[in-house]
Amino acid sequence: MSRTLVLVRHGQSEWNLKNLFTGWRDPGLTEQGHAEAKAAGQRLKAAGLKFDIAYTSALSRAQVTCQHILDELGQPGLETIRDQALNERDYGDLSGLNKDDARAKWGEEQVHIWRRSYDVPPPGGESLKDTGARVWPYYLHTIQPHVLREETVLVAAHGNSLRTLIMALDGLTPEQILKQELNTGVPIIYRLNADSTVASKEILSA
């Protein structure tokens, strides 16, 4: 038995490809995104993993990624919990804008602050700190108990919602987590100790 948590950022979305701020908007996956999600499932299968339960956000790009992974593992009907607590960071007024257009409107420095500061939200949106304030409690109260019961748990979500989990699990500072990029469709496997600390971490790159 193992206490295993697998985090996967969704495959490339249509708006990732167009360089748009996405947040809580709900574009689908590109062909590449579908392929990335299926490949993630294949790598997890090769690693010998099977899941006891899956969690994903309320957004289709994460849900479809989750389903592709489960299909590849031969677990298409696995219990899957969908919750907006795992949604991407809400970019507020930036949502739907091309990143270059946002820089033209507000200035490169201001947009950089909104994107890469820990606690400064864009207008009408969330900071990374705000995102963590909903993601981490949800993890502690809902997801972690399954892991500590020696289950294997999948979380298919988003770059910033997963970044806040990684920050807490790895004990990183805001400065450290802001420098980390999460590639689309790449599984991160955590094995936890009985006291919920991290025993090991493995990134299943292609």
Curated annotation (Swiss-Prot):
Summary of the function given for this chain in its UniProt record: Catalyzes the interconversion of 2-phosphoglycerate and 3-phosphoglycerate.
Keyword entries, A-Z: Gluconeogenesis, Glycolysis, Isomerase
Catalysed reaction, written as an equation: (2R)-2-phosphoglycerate = (2R)-3-phosphoglycerate
Family the entry assigns: Belongs to the phosphoglycerate mutase family. BPG-dependent PGAM subfamily.
Enzyme Commission number(s): 5.4.2.11
Keyword Isomerase attributed: yes
Signal sequence, start to end: none
Name under which the protein is recorded: 2,3-bisphosphoglycerate-dependent phosphoglycerate mutase
Subunit structure and binding partners: Homodimer.
CDD domains tied to this protein: HP_PGM_like (cd07067)
HAMAP family the UniProt entry points to: PGAM_GpmA
Site (Transition state stabilizer): 158
Phylogenetic lineage: Bacteria, Pseudomonadati, Pseudomonadota, Alphaproteobacteria, Hyphomicrobiales
GO biological process: gluconeogenesis; glycolytic process
Underlying gene: gpmA
Active-site positions on this chain: 10 (tele-phosphohistidine intermediate), 88 (proton donor/acceptor)
Matching InterPro entries: His_Pase_superF_clade-1 (IPR013078), His_PPase_superfam (IPR029033), PG/BPGM_mutase_AS (IPR001345), Phosphogly_mut1 (IPR005952)
